[in-house]
Swiss-Prot record:
Subunit structure, as described in the record: NDH-1 is composed of 14 different subunits. Subunits NuoB, C, D, E, F, and G constitute the peripheral sector of the complex.
Lineage top rank: taxon: Bacteria
Family listed: Belongs to the complex I 49 kDa subunit family.
Keyword field contains Nucleotide-binding: no
Protein's organism: Leptospira borgpetersenii serovar Hardjo-bovis (strain JB197)
Covalent S-S links between cysteines: none
SUPFAM superfamilies tied to this protein: HydB/Nqo4-like
Name assigned to this protein: NADH-quinone oxidoreductase subunit D
Length: 404
């Protein structure tokens, strides 16, 4: 291993062939959508070699996970893929609940699934909208961003925050859904359906967009698997793998939805897969929203779920539980577990090793962006510099998740 310093690049590329240039795409550049750096050697407009540099937003989350309690680490998950934070929250909480063998009420699972799919739609809107902007098609983005804002308003009313939601808890939710939740979710889905089709016509059927994306940045199924691809980027390469279908969690085995599959793993096919996934997410939400069961929004778990404040102030038993959870944390039984969920970008996995204390002994996060970014040099090598922007955008690399 070596550190990719300025001296490293100076030594490696000090004898460039005549006519070749070394350019930096990032770390501060609109096309990178985050603090990412790519050192690119070009011959005219053609990319000869590329090298990716990571770590600009590294915040030691895995090490923090060994110091924080299981509840405290939840705030770190908000700051991974900050475009669809509830999916990160749910992935972490499911891993902890699995280790504790906690069964949550169906109401909790329904709400978690609805929020997950709304977050997936938000993430795909960002990815597709910004891809259009990167290729010069600004107007198409506006058709979906209005509906993304409507989803944000639901999440803000439900959680109190737009980005750092921290909504899940071990054994349940932070609070119950508000009275108009089901109605507003159905209105959002109703508005999204025609908007998605309009956006599809404006962007994915546009001749210029097709010319800039078809066959660009492609990857074979074999190479995608070798690099560790998952999610929409893996399915765009023709691999039928979705954690929700192949290793179901929550109630995904009880709902009906299709898994879209691409062919050549190009920018176009990654876009087509994400477009269809938005339709399928709406389909999942509509199956759930009318059937949210009544009942509690958390399990009867006094040693792990904080009691209501009014009970803490008026009941000695609740006061003791509150004190124990805050001061001593939640004790997870000794053991190790890996929990994978299908986040918007792919398989988000949390590997936890517990020694029975209030903090994990070891935490590892399998973040999908990390694997995509490793492939970037191979995907753009031999292509045009302008096409590298589209390739990066279609991979949907989020710096907060990449560096973790």
């Amino acid at each position: 291993m070596y550190e990719k310093t300025a001296e490293h690049f100076e030594q490696k590329y000090k004898n460039l062939p005549e006519g070749h240039l070394l350019v930096n795409l990032g770390p501060s550049h609109p096309a990178t959508h985050g603090i990412l750096q790519n050192v690119i050697q070009i011959d005219g407009e053609r990319i000869v070699e590329a090298e990716s540099v990571i770590g600009y937003v590294h915040r030691c989350f895995e090490k923090l996970g060994e110091r924080y309690t299981y509840n405290q680490f939840l705030v770190c998950t908000d700051r991974m893929n900050y475009v669809s934070t509830p999916l990160n929250n749910i992935g972490w909480i499911l891993a902890v609940e699995k280790m504790m063998q906690v069964e949550v009420p169906d109401r909790v699972t329904y709400v978690r699934m609805i929020i997950s799919e709304l977050s997936r739609i938000m993430d795909h809107i960002i990815c597709l909208g910004i891809l259009g902007v990167d290729l010069g098609a600004f107007s198409g983005m506006l058709h979906l961003f209005h509906h993304r804002e409507n989803i944000y308003q639901i999440i803000e009313k439900l959680t109190g925050a737009r980005l750092t939601t921290t909504f899940c808890r071990i054994g349940g939710l932070e609070r119950d859904i508000y009275p108009e939740f089901e109605k507003e979710v159905k209105l959002v889905c109703k508005g999204l359906k025609p908007a998605i089709e309009e956006f599809n016509s404006l962007l994915l059927k546009n001749k210029i967009f097709l010319g800039r994306t078809e066959g660009i940045g492609g990857i074979s199924a074999e190479n995608a698997i070798a690099y560790g691809f998952s999610g929409p980027n893996l399915r765009a390469a023709g691999v039928d793998w979705d954690v929700r279908k192949d290793k179901p969690y929550m109630l995904y085995d009880k709902v009906d939805f299709d898994v879209p599959i691409g062919e050549d793993g190009s920018v176009l096919h990654r876009s087509l897969v994400r477009m269809e996934e938005m339709r399928q997410s709406i389909r999942i939400i509509e199956q759930l929203v009318d059937g949210i069961p009544s009942g509690a929004w958390h399990a009867d778990l006094p040693h792990a779920y904080l009691p209501e404040k009014n009970k803490v102030y008026n009941n000695m038993e609740e006061l003791i539980y509150h004190f124990k959870i805050i001061m001593h944390g939640v004790k997870v039984p000794p053991g190790e577990h890996y929990m994978a969920t299908e986040a918007a970008n792919g398989e988000l996995g949390f590997y936890i090793v517990s020694e029975g204390e209030k903090s994990p002994w070891r935490v590892h996060v399998r973040r999908p962006c990390f694997w995509y970014y490793q492939s970037f040099a191979e995907l753009v090598r031999g292509g045009l510099l302008a096409d590298s922007v589209a390739t990066m955008s279609s991979l949907n690399v989020i710096a907060g998740e990449l560096d973790c």
